[in-house]
Amino acid sequence: MRYNQFSYIPTSLERAAEELKELGFDLDLQKTAKVNLESFLRKLFFHYPDSDYPLSHLITKNDMDALSFFQSEQELSKEVFDLLALQVLGFIPGVDFTEADAFLDKLAFPIHFDETEIIKHIHHILATRCKSGMTLIDDLVSQGMLTMDNDYHFFNGKSLATFDTSQLIREVVYVEAPLDTDQDGQLDLIKVNIIRPQSQKPLPTLMTPSPYHQGINEVANDKKLYRMEKELVVKKRRQITVEDRDFIPLETQPCKLPIGQNLEIFSYINSYSLNDYFLARGFANIYVSGVGTAGSTGFMTSGDYAQIESFKAVIDWLNGRATAYTSHSKTHQVRADWANGLVCTTGKSYLGTMSTGLATTGVDGLAMIIAESAISSWYNYYRENGLVCSPGGYPGEDLDVLTELTYSRNLLAGDYLRHNDRYQELLNQQSQALDRQSGDYNQFWHDRNYLKNAHQIKCDVVYTHGLQDWNVKPRQVYEIVNALPSTINKHLFLHQGEHVYMHNWQSIDFRESMNVLLCQKLLGLANDFSLPEMIWQDNTCPQNWQERKVFGTSTIKELDLGQELLLIDNHYGEDEFKAYGKDFRAFKAALFKGKANQALVDILLEEDLPINGEIVLQLKVKSSENKGLLSAQILDYGKKKRLGDLPIALTQSSIDNGQNFSREPLKELPFREDSYRVISKGFMNLQNRNNLSSIETIPNNKWMTVRLPLQPTIYHLEKGDTLRVILYTTDFEHTVRDNSNYALTIDLSQSQLIVPIASN
């Protein structure tokens, strides 16, 4: 374990003493450090009628327990304080460590003993994470140190788990959206699942906009998947034009219906554990799936601003600007009289994507988004540089396939009976509009590009993204973060994992950092907290997070690739082609071992190479035919210890998100030896070699200069490492699988790898 503590707010002695007193710690500024420390330790053992017994189980030296120490005349020293601090945080002498000083250095322990600062040290210890993954104060509250009185209690700028999660209100309302996405002449209704504590105070809301939450249709999804085996189409030379079109909602009328009291209830919905954490701390949770999902009406428009509007309508309702009904019969309306109107959205992938889309509307009431692994341009999710390009792990998927997966109205037999014919018509229109034939950018994709509206974002934003996420690739967060207005508060966490959540990792206090931000933005708590704009997980060692200023630098280093002419054959034998098509992982294994059709260049680094931004391959290329696709991957190659990309469970249920509520495992990325790590990758239709909007011809056997931008990253290579460049054509995971008999030639003497370099 290593501490990377960003959430602690440095506190004055007077404020620390005041907060400790509010928690029931009987400390006195006039008493000695030793007396105050003993009083603190005894309070930790509030379950025991006699605190001598648990105190005797702590040690202060190899030959003395804590009870004996406090009964003695010995003075409090750094050695004693450090040993006791480690033990109350769950570290066991002789098991987790033998030499405390060395262990504290390894932990990067954030508290440094000063006898005159003992009150502040005690305050800091309570706000510091235990070995279990919870802060000490959260651990104590989870055991019942504070009663669940359904009121707010704060410590170090964070809300504590004092809301009763055994008596939650679970109810359903149906919000009227200014939409008619299925064109049936009726405004769409949006089902909203609400989970909230019983409280006399107006509650802020965490809203998870999740098209998955009302169920998914995997059968329809699998039937809709596309075959990737097809020839690369030769496109006509042309210029693509698109236009910015404002979304115009339909008109709605003020509701004059009576207020209803009898709401639909539910017992369970699949929840997000970060939401659960905040539910126990006085934040209502709502789950909304939007248009075209079970319980709602309308068509699944998948990514456009009509879909975004269906979530925006819910925020409008929370602020009294939209109508919600008790049921589809629309006999009674219901008001969000329990809400304070302030909303933060949460969730990963599609869920985080909807958060970004919502933020670009500038809707009042949306105070903050926490968007994890989020899409900012749907074209860049399903296409790349004029190519159909599947997200990692999902060859054959496209946006209309996702529509089939998430149009959960068809899971309700009655809805299927009444609406499937119209749904199929609209789905066919969507399939045509996305233009899988050419892979080109068009108006359909432009209408699903949130980057063009990034200037309208006014809420605080928090993004997390994995630099090994080849599903929602790093370009998605790179482009939105760099498009954000300079006037807003923004925070980016870049980790070394893949498409995963990070709130329950041991090495970073993400959960607590979000607590402070949400108390600021949604509860109006003045807490003087400042979180760095960007925090990056160091790839060279375990559990090390560093502050960074920018994602993407203008300083570059050009690396020569060699002097040879390299030939890349596109065609595979029939058996090999079928085998790779059946299992793209077999292709990846062959590619990284140098056994697939490829051109390979190894560069032995003579100095450190700190990459920050978008690597560009500038290549001199020619094709034997009038078509060609180019794929590239950059590897950190050679055996050494690296971070894995999937977090593993260190404990199974050590994190309690409330008071015995929604327990979850503590996780971390493993650090172990492997043979390589993908740093970046990229794909291009050579007909789009200049830009997305220009379709060029490819002259047979004529040299072309190509700039292939790869996925942005931050990655540190060290002197002596090998950087491997792999150039090839068909990628069996991502691109169309064209097995035609053409070849690309690369002139390495006229080619370079252009690397953005991080400054010291």
Swiss-Prot record:
Disulfide bonding pattern of the chain: none
Q: Which GO terms describe its biological process?
A: proteolysis
Spell out the molecular function terms from Gene Ontology.
aminopeptidase activity; dipeptidyl-peptidase activity; serine-type peptidase activity
Q: Where in or outside the cell is it found? A: Cytoplasm
Q: What are its E.C. numbers?
A: 3.4.14.11
Naming one, the record's GO cellular component terms include:
cytoplasm
Entry annotated with the keyword Metal-binding: no
Q: Which InterPro entries match?
A: AB_hydrolase_fold, Galactose-bd-like_sf, Pept_S15_Xpro, PepX_N_dom, PepX_N_dom_sf, Xaa-Pro-like_dom, Xaa-Pro_dipept_C, Xaa-Pro_dipeptidyl-ppase/CocE
Q: Which UniProt keywords apply?
A: Aminopeptidase, Cytoplasm, Hydrolase, Protease, Serine protease
- Signal sequence bounds: none
Source organism's superkingdom?
Bacteria
Q: What enzyme class is recorded for this protein?
A: hydrolase
| Protein family according to the UniProt entry | Belongs to the peptidase S15 family.
Whom does it interact with, and what assembly results?
A: Homodimer.
Name of the protein in its database record = Xaa-Pro dipeptidyl-peptidase
Q: Which gene encodes it?
A: pepX
